[in-house]
UniProtKB/Swiss-Prot annotation:
Identification of the protein by name: Mitochondrial sodium/calcium exchanger protein
Extracellular topology ranges: 27-95, 162-168, 227-229, 347-360, 405-416, 467-491, 547-559
UniProt keyword list: Antiport, Calcium, Calcium transport, Cell membrane, Glycoprotein, Ion transport, Lithium, Membrane, Mitochondrion, Mitochondrion inner membrane, Phosphoprotein, Sensory transduction, Signal, Sodium, Sodium transport, Transmembrane, Transmembrane helix, Transport
MF annotations from Gene Ontology: calcium:sodium antiporter activity; calcium:sodium antiporter activity involved in regulation of cardiac muscle cell membrane potential; protein homodimerization activity
Organism: Mus musculus (Mouse)
Ion transport among keywords: yes
C-alpha cells in the first residue's frame, strides 16, 4: 500500500515534467526575440501603446501589411509561422478567401496531428509509465489516463494563457468544452444507449466540477488569479484523486466482505466485466497492431527498421472502405514522422515494442526534436560558448549513446532499461502536442482578427470542437458497444481534469515564468458570463433531473441536453454580434 501512495506522489511530477521544462526555459531566454511588449505584472498587464490588431481589416489594402508588421499586438509570441503577416503580406487582397481556406485546412490538419499524437504515442507511453510505477487502474485513470485524454485541451490552455491577448481562448475552450461534453456528448450517449447511471460517482464528479466552475467564475469576476488561487486549483484536483481512490478502496472492501450480494445490490460502480473492458481499453490496447511486421521469423536489422517505420498495414488497407483509405493517406506523413521521432513502449507485448534499429535511431532524433520544439526552437539554435549550437551537441551526445545501445543490445530481446524509452517518448510526444497546440492558438487568433471575432467565441466553438471531437467519438463507440456508464463517467472525469489543471497549471507556470504574484484576466464582455452561466445551468439541470429519474437516463434526457446546447449556441452568436447586449447607463 505504501508503494502505491509513493507512486501516486510521483504521478503529478511526471505529468508536469515537459511543461516545467517549457516554462523554465522562458526565464533567461537566450534568444534575441522580443518579448518585452507584453508582460504580466503584479498590478496590471504592462503593454506598449498599440492599436487593436483587429483594426487591420478597416484599413486600405496597401496599408495592411505595414500595420501588422509594425503593430506589436499583431505579433505572435510563440510558434513557427506568422499567420497574420502571411495573409496580409504574401497574399493579394483578391486572394484573401483562398488564404482563409488554406488556413482552415491547416487548422483541421493540426487537430488531426493532435489527435494522432495523443492517441497513438502520448497515451501508450503514459500507460507504460503507470505500469512501471505499479499504479492501480483507478489511480492511473484519474492521473495519467486523464492527462493523456486531455492533452490537446491542456496544452492549448497553457499556450493560450501564456499571452494575455489569447487568455480568452483558454477560458472559452475550457468552458465551451465543458458545455459541449456535458450536453452533446452526454446526451448522445443516453440517446444511443439508455442506462442507469452510477449514483455516487455521478454525484461526486458533478459536485467537484461545479466547484471548479464556481472557482473559475469567481476568478473571472475578480479579474485575476493569484498564486494561492492557482495552487488551489491543483490542490482541488489532488483532493479529487484522493477521493476517487478512497471511494474505490471502500467499495472494494465492502465487496470483499459480501461477495454474494455485490452483483445484485451494487449498481454504484462499474461491473466487473465493464471494469475489465475499461482496463483493456485504457491499458492493454495494442497500439502497434497497425505497424506489426507482415513477415514472421528472424529478420535482419534493416528489415526491422523498414517494418517499424511503415505506418501502413497492407492487409488492413485491402479490407477498408474508401473513406478510411483517404483519411489514412492524409495521416501517413504525420504517422511516419511520429514513428521516426517518438519511441513507444508497450508492456503488454512480449518484446515491449522493442525495435533495436529504430529505438537507437530515436536516441539521436528524439532529443533533437526536444530542443527544436522547446520554446519554438530558440534553444536549439543557441550557441554554447559561441562555438557549437545546442542542436549539434545534442546530435553528438545522442549518436554516442545510440552507438553504445546498438552494440550492447540485440534485436530479439529488449534491454533491461528499455522502460526508460517510455519517458523519452512521453516528453517528445508532449512537445509535439505543445508545438501543434501553439500553431492552433495562433491560427485561431488570426482568424479572429480577420473576422473580428472575440477569442472567447473562437475558443468555445472551433477550439472546443476540435479538441473534443476525438473524445466524443470514443465515448459514442463505447456506448454502442454496451458500456454507456463508462462513457458517461469519462465525460465528467475528463473535464474536471481539464479545467482544474488547465487553469491552475497554466496560471501557475505564467506566475513562475514572469516572476509576478497574479495573472490578470480580461473577460470578453457579456459573452464570458453567458458561457459560464450556460455551463452552470447545464450542470444544475443534470444534478436535479438525473436523481429525479432515479438515475435511469432515457432518450428524452439526452434530447433535452442536445436542445440546451443548440439554444446555447444561438444565444452565444446573438451576443457576439451585438443582438443581445447590456443597456448602457
Amino acid at each position: 500500500m505504501a508503494s502505491r501512495w509513493l507512486a501516486l506522489l510521483w504521478a503529478p511530477v511526471f505529468l508536469c515534467v515537459a511543461l516545467i521544462l517549457e516554462t523554465a526555459s522562458g526565464t533567461g531566454d537566450p534568444s534575441t526575440k522580443a518579448h518585452g511588449h507584453i508582460q504580466f505584472s503584479a498590478g496590471s498587464v504592462n503593454q506598449t501603446a498599440m492599436a487593436d490588431c483587429r483594426a487591420v481589416c478597416g484599413l486600405n489594402t496597401s496599408d495592411r501589411c505595414d500595420f501588422v508588421r509594425r503593430n506589436p499586438d499583431c505579433r505572435s509570441e510563440a510558434g513557427y509561422l506568422d499567420y497574420l503577416e502571411g495573409i496580409f503580406c504574401y497574399f493579394p487582397p483578391n486572394l484573401l478567401p483562398l488564404a482563409i481556406t488554406l488556413y482552415v485546412f491547416w487548422l483541421l490538419y493540426l487537430f488531426l496531428i493532435l489527435g494522432v499524437t495523443a492517441a497513438k504515442f502520448f497515451c501508450p507511453n503514459l500507460s507504460a509509465i503507470s505500469t512501471n510505477l505499479k499504479l492501480s487502474h483507478n489511480v492511473a485513470g484519474v492521473t495519467f489516463l486523464a492527462f493523456g485524454n486531455g492533452a490537446p485541451d491542456i496544452f492549448s490552455a497553457l499556450v493560450a494563457f501564456s499571452d494575455p491577448r489569447t487568455a480568452g481562448l483558454a477560458i472559452g475552450a475550457l468552458f465551451g468544452a465543458g458545455v459541449l461534453v456535458t450536453t452533446v456528448v452526454a446526451g448522445g450517449i443516453t440517446i444511443l444507449h439508455p442506462f442507469m447511471a452510477a449514483s455516487r460517482p455521478f454525484l461526486r464528479d458533478i459536485a467537484f466540477y461545479m466547484v471548479a466552475v464556481f472557482l473559475t467564475f469567481t476568478a473571472l469576476y475578480l479579474g485575476r488569479i493569484t498564486l494561492t488561487w492557482a495552487l488551489g486549483y491543483l490542490g482541488l484536483y489532488v483532493f479529487y484523486v484522493v477521493t476517487v481512490i478512497i471511494c474505490t478502496w471502500v467499495y472494494q472492501r465492502q465487496r470483499s466482505r459480501s461477495l454474494v450480494h455485490s452483483i445484485s445490490e451494487t449498481p454504484e460502480l462499474l461491473s466487473e466485466s465493464e471494469e475489465d473492458q475499461m482496463s483493456s481499453n485504457t491499458n492493454s490496447y495494442d497500439y502497434g497492431d497497425e505497424y506489426r511486421p507482415l513477415l514472421l521469423g528472424r529478420e535482419t536489422t534493416v528489415q526491422i527498421l523498414i517494418q517499424a517505420l511503415n505506418p501502413l498495414d497492407y492487409r488492413k488497407w485491402r479490407t477498408q472502405s474508401i473513406s478510411w483509405r483517404v483519411l489514412k493517406v492524409v495521416k501517413l506523413p504525420v504517422e511516419f514522422l511520429l514513428l521516426l521521432t517518438v519511441p513507444v513502449v508497450d508492456p503488454d507485448k512480449d518484446d515491449r515494442n522493442w525495435k533495436r534499429p529504430l529505438n537507437c535511431l530515436q536516441l539521436v532524433i528524439s532529443p533533437l526534436v526536444l530542443v527544436l520544439t522547446l520554446q519554438s526552437g530558440v534553444y536549439g539554435i543557441y550557441e554554447i560558448g559561441g562555438l557549437l549550437p545546442v542542436w549539434a551537441v545534442v546530435v553528438i551526445v545522442g549518436t554516442a549513446l545510440a552507438s553504445v545501445t546498438f552494440f550492447a543490445t540485440s534485436n530479439r530481446e529488449p534491454p533491461r532499461l528499455h522502460w526508460l524509452f517510455a519517458f523519452l517518448g512521453f516528453l517528445t510526444s508532449a512537445l509535439w502536442i505543445n508545438a501543434a497546440a501553439t500553431e492552433v492558438v495562433n491560427i485561431l487568433r488570426s482568424l479572429g482578427v480577420i473576422f473580428r471575432l472575440s477569442n472567447t467565441v473562437l475558443g468555445l466553438t472551433l477550439l472546443a470542437w476540435g479538441n473534443s471531437i476525438g473524445d466524443a467519438f470514443s465515448d459514442f463507440t463505447l456506448a454502442r458497444q454496451g458500456y454507456p456508464r463508462m462513457a458517461f463517467s469519462a465525460c465528467f472525469g475528463g473535464i474536471i481534469f481539464n479545467i482544474l489543471v488547465g487553469v491552475g497549471l497554466g496560471c501557475l507556470l505564467q506566475i513562475i515564468r514572469n516572476h509576478v504574484v497574479e495573472v490578470k484576466l480580461e473577460p470578453d464582455g457579456l459573452l464570458v458570463w453567458v458561457l459560464a452561466s450556460a455551463l452552470g445551468l447545464s450542470l444544475i439541470f443534470s444534478l436535479v433531473s438525473v436523481p429525479l429519474q432515479c438515475f435511469q437516463l432515457s432518450k428524452a434526457y439526452g434530447l433535452c441536453l442536445l436542445l440546451f446546447y443548440i439554444c446555447f449556441l444561438v444565444v452565444v452568436l446573438l451576443t457576439e454580434f451585438g443582438v443581445i447586449h447590456l443597456k448602457k447607463a
